[in-house]
Amino acid sequence: MRVISRARSACTWTSCTSLSPCSTSCPPSPAAPTLLRRRSLPQQRRRPSSSPNRRVRGVTTSPCPTRSLVYKRRVGAPQRLCAETVATMQAQEANALLLSRMEALEWFKKFTVWLRVYAIFIFQLAFSFGLGSVFWLGFPQNRNFCVENYSFFLTVLVPIVCMFITYTLGNEHPSNATVLFIYLLANSLTAAIFQMCSESRVLVGSYVMTLALFISFTGLAFLGGRDRRRWKCISCVYVVMLLSFLTLALLSDADWLQKIVVTLCAFSISFFLGILAYDSLMVIFFCPPNQCIRHAVCLYLDSMAIFLTLLLMLSGPRWISLSDGAPLDNGTLTAASTTGKS
């Protein structure tokens, strides 16, 4: 069998046999490499697998385009790691560690802001409750003041007006000690007069319920965060609880006027709790260090509105019954009895 290869421009035709290899100075034709590749292909297939991947006790090495590849066996399938990839991963781990440190520092700054806000809030709430207790103990003869003066119920609007001012001004609202004490005195006096008209068990119950609601909704604000699904679940649970409470209140044997007062107070408390949750989210995520007083005042106004509404809901039915001529409890003094004795 003869193989004829054609030389290019300056080459001549040469003939050779399969037994004697061709020797010519001409460059090989384009068909020659193809023929050679076809001949060498079976030889390459018959060669033993010369794969560069050679495993030695769970570690296999193979050439990389630039550097060597390293295979490491981990929990089943081996993971392919190049030297450059290893270096990149180490750099990413270092960056991740640095980022976590920065996040920790940022979280610590937020934590200090939270401490400032809630410390100011606790001071305001303690001052208001303490002043109210002093008024309640110092003026027992005015225990029936709210029964004779229905117009005093309008003082419940004091924290609502303060809330309207703070939300209207927004970030332009001043955040200093002067503003803090103005809001503190205005709401503390209102709460103190309201407490004079209430019984001791009603006061203690209002204190406990206000603190419990504040702690609960602050915890829900941390739990819900910015997740809408969680807030939907929280809202559904709260609506079910509210409807259950209203059903029990409406099915009771109380007067229809008392039922109306309880229903209105329940909806008002729900509204204030929603504002409290919103203010708590603002403190958690969007409170700068120079606005701590303003955010603490917002939380304080929300809590005072809830407290006064609870007092009105728990003491309102009794005030209504007293105004209709119902007998007073033992040990309760009224303005009329005091005037008659004098």
Swiss-Prot record:
UniProt entry tagged with the keyword Aminoacyl-tRNA synthetase: no
Stretch list, region Disordered: 21-64
User: Where, by residue number, does the polypeptide cross the bilayer?
Assistant: 119-139, 150-170, 177-197, 202-222, 231-251, 266-286, 296-316
- Output the lineage of the source organism: Viruses, Duplodnaviria, Heunggongvirae, Peploviricota, Herviviricetes
- Give the source species: Human cytomegalovirus (strain AD169) (HHV-5)
Where does the record place it? Membrane
Q: Which gene encodes it?
A: US20
The protein's matches in PANTHER family, at most eight in alphabetical order, are given as: BAX INHIBITOR-RELATED, PROTEIN LIFEGUARD 4
Its main subcellular localisation, reduced to a broad class, is membrane
Organism's domain of life? Viruses
Give the record's membrane topology: Multi-pass membrane protein
Q: What is this protein called?
A: Transmembrane protein HWLF3
What cellular component GO annotations does this protein have?
Answer: membrane
Q: Which InterPro entries match?
A: Bax_inhibitor_1-related
Residues of this chain annotated as glycosylated in UniProt: N149, N176, N330
Family recorded in the similarity comment: Belongs to the cytomegalovirus US12 family.
Q: Where is the composition biased (Basic residues)?
A: 36-48
Q: Which UniProt keywords apply?
A: Glycoprotein, Late protein, Membrane, Transmembrane, Transmembrane helix
